[in-house]
Amino acid sequence: MLPAVLVSVLLATCGVWWGLTIIAWITWEKRFESPTKSADSLQDTEKKPTWKSKLVDAIEFGAPTVLAVGLAVDGFTGRALLSAAGWSIPVPFSEGFQILGTVLLFAGLPLFTAGAYLTGRYVYSRPPTDRPLLQKGPYRFIRHPIYLAFMLVAVGFILLALNLVMLPLVYMFTAITYPKQEEPELIKLYGGAYREYQQRTGRFLPKFRRG
């Protein structure tokens, strides 16, 4: 196992990074909000999220920060959970898994931040009819970088911590099902342009052209 202090530092750093990105995402959406989005939100009350959906979103998006930072604090103080036999997950080559988890985190978090900025600026700040087909940054190569980031971050935290506390993050793997629900709506919205975009890009991994 990697030293508990190092694991705690990495958990705290990545947990705070995730949380700050969520806050920044909301800020970017508000900062770049178009006048038409503001007008539509005042007129359309049916599509406003309910308090229940807001609560679910808060739990889902807040869990990585709460669990990672909480476990990091435990590691800095008494290690009642981080190194405890009843909570640690014993695996062979544990250091290798933890290093892999760190690599996945530092791949997933920048991807998540980039996706949050781009969607906050160009997508969620506008009403659906005014949203461009986003093809900037990672969207040039894959269609769902944020969902890929969800899964990378979930695996990263679990492997880095090797602790039962982080296992609830497996819920983030449900992101793999979201594109199947969303892409038919995107085809309706963008038509042939989105179909052409599908041919050029992969859902989660880039497509490599031959020749």
Task: Label the predicted regions.
Residues 126-147:
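Active-site-proximal inter-transmembrane loops
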